[in-house]
């Protein structure tokens, strides 16, 4: 099957720092034949020189990333690989400082996630601590609407004793309890014991863990359910913009993922908040010209008369007859995860929704609600603290597109960030639209 016939899945790899995400992805790409021996040899030589033998596969990812960053193409420069059943795009190779921020903007576009946890003594516990990213990433994945998760229990070669079934079971139990509390269907989640370093259970079944009878990592990827394109295609068009390139001979090329609706060559589109628009001249995906783009497609497209200065990351493209909503203010159900003291009216976190990030002030805290039942506990509370859920009204300080969650899920959920941390997560229940004049280029 060619990549056209295979269903396409966007994958995000999450988990605590140093739990082996990059090494696992590197080894996976290598085992599936998406990295040639020559590249690997070169990387190994370089790694040896710098005494980084053990980071062989992680290095590979960084190298691939640098290569791509040097040659900017229209395509969303992501890592791609195929399994027998699917054509995958990894939409964020983790590891950088901005990963949570990227995860918030990227996760809204992921169809599934691989959560990597380390089984090495002390490392799993660090990831699950109050400051741990394992907890934070699982929580964000849930908010961002990712229901399909594969858990890779990594570094099984480093347990005490190595390949310990007891340690594996302990980790699975802890994670199941935590994830169940967040509403994940834990019985549908595969927990695959792997070693990113030795390659155990990535493609080949591990001889070191005969006690494990479940799928390998690649089998677990193939067991994922395909995304429902039909459901999203029926909605009006929404394409959050990730980047805007100037390509010689083509012109301005916004790049993004079609979240809802269908984009065809010849369509008129408008970008909000700026309100500029024009006719779609061409659409490209994975370096190939296409006539129409469906939900889930990562595309670059050229619009007549729209210049690079008119639009930016965070803008959203739609059809002029049903343009994306620019919010004057919006109401949301929020859940507070972290704050050093308390949150009151006037607090201004940065709201990350789809690819946008805009500082927004809390102008009213309407109700405190029970996070489990949604019942109102208190009207007009004076402050909120971690663990509270509430109905809150925000006013964005700059124009921003945000939609009701019920109407456009991918554009109706957000994370609140402050001081480099995720303060809370939320879903939009109502939007008071701002007036924006639409200027279509002839």
Curated annotation (Swiss-Prot):
It is an enzyme of class 3 (hydrolase). Residues 6-229 form the tr-type G domain. Residues 195-197 are annotated as: G5. GTP binds at residues 15-22, 92-96, 154-157. It is found in: Cytoplasm. GO terms for molecular function: GTP binding; GTPase activity; translation elongation factor activity. Residues 92-95 are annotated as: G3. This is Elongation factor 1-alpha. It comes from Ignicoccus hospitalis (strain KIN4/I / DSM 18386 / JCM 14125).
């Amino acid at each position: 099957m060619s990549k056209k016939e295979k269903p396409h899945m966007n994958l995000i790899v999450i988990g605590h720092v140093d739990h082996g995400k990059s090494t696992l992805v590197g080894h996976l790409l290598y085992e599936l034949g998406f990295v040639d021996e020559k590249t690997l040899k070169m990387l190994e030589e370089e790694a040896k020189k710098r005494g980084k033998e053990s980071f062989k596969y992680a290095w590979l990812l960084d190298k691939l990333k640098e290569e791509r960053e040097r040659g900017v193409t229209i395509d969303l420069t992501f890592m791609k690989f195929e399994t027998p059943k699917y054509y995958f795009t990894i939409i964020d190779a983790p590891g950088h400082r901005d990963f949570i921020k990227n995860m918030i903007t990227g996760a809204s576009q992921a169809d599934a996630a691989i959560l990597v946890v380390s089984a090495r003594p002390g490392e799993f516990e660090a990831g699950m601590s109050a400051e741990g990213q394992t907890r934070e990433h699982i929580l964000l994945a849930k908010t961002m609407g990712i229901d399909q998760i594969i858990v890779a229990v990594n570094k099984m070669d480093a347990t005490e004793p190595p390949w310990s079934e007891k340690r594996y079971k302990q980790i699975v139990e802890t994670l199941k309890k935590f994830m169940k509390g967040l509403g994940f269907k834990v019985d549908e989640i595969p927990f695959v014991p792997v070693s990113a370093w030795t390659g155990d259970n990535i493609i080949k079944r591990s001889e070191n863990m005969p006690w494990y009878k479940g799928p390998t990592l690649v089998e677990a990827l193939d067991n994922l359910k395909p995304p429902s394109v039909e459901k999203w295609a029926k909605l009006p068009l929404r394409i959050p913009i990730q980047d805007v390139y100037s390509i010689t001979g083509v012109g301005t090329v916004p790049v993004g993922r079609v979240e809802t609706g269908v984009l065809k060559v010849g369509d008129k589109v408008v970008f909000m908040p700026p309100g500029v628009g024009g006719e779609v001249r061409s659409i490209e995906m994975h370096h190939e010209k296409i006539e129409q783009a469906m939900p889930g497609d990562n595309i670059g497209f050229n619009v007549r008369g729209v210049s690079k200065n008119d639009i930016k990351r965070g803008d959203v493209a739609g059809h002029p007859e049903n343009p994306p909503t620019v919010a004057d203010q919006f109401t949301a159900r929020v859940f507070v995860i972290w704050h050093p003291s308390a949150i009151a009216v006037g607090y201004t976190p940065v709201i990350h929704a789809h690819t946008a990030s805009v500082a927004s002030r809390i102008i009213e805290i309407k109700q405190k609600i029970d996070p489990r039942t949604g019942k109102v506990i208190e009207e007009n509370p004076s402050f909120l603290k971690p663990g509270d859920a509430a109905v809150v009204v925000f006013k964005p300080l700059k124009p921003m597109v945000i939609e009701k969650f019920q109407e456009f899920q991918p554009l109706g959920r957000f994370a609140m960030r402050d001081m480099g941390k995720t303060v809370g997560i939320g879903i939009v229940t109502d939007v008071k639209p701002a007036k924006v004049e639409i200027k279509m280029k002839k």
